[in-house]
Amino acid sequence: MTIMMVAALLAGAGLAQAQWERIEKNMPLALAEELAAAAVADCQAKGYAVTATVVDRAGLVKVMHRADGAGPHTIDASRRKAYTSASARNNTTAMMENSQKNPGAQNLGQIDGFLMLGGGMPVRAGNEVIGAIGVGGAPAGHLDDQCAQAALDKVKDRLK
C-alpha cells in the first residue's frame, strides 16, 4: 500500500511539473544576422540606404546592420519597428492602418518604444513568433516592408 501511495504521489508531482513547463523556440544569432544582412542588401539593390534590426521574442536587439550612407535616425526607427512588431506579434503596417480606423487603437503609438510605421514584421517559426525584423530608411514604409519581406522570404524554408 505504501509503495502505491508513493508511486501515485511521484506520478502526480511529475504531472504538475509538466503543466508548468513551456518550451519556446528562439531565434539563433546566425538567423538574425542573415535576416538583417538580406534586408539591407535588398534595399541597397533598390537604391535605399537603410538600417535593419532584428530582435528576439522579448524585443531585445539580436543584431543591427546599418548600410553605408543610412541616416542616423534609421537606427532608432528600425529598432522601434522591430520592437513594436515583436511585442504585438503583428506587422507594423497593419497596426498603423488599424490605429487609423479604430479609435480604441489610436493610442498604441504612445506606448514607450512603439513606432507604428511600415517596416516591422514578426519572424515566425511555424505559428510561433520568435522575434521580429525592423527596417528603416527607405523613402516610405511600404518600401521598408518590401525589404523586410524579402529577407523573410530568403529564410522561410528554415522557419517551419
Give each language-model segment a name.
Residues 1-2, 23:
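Long, non-catalytic terminal segments
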Residues 2-13:
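Bacterial N-terminal signal peptides
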Residues 17-160:
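Flexible, solvent-exposed loop/hinge segments and secondary-structure transition points
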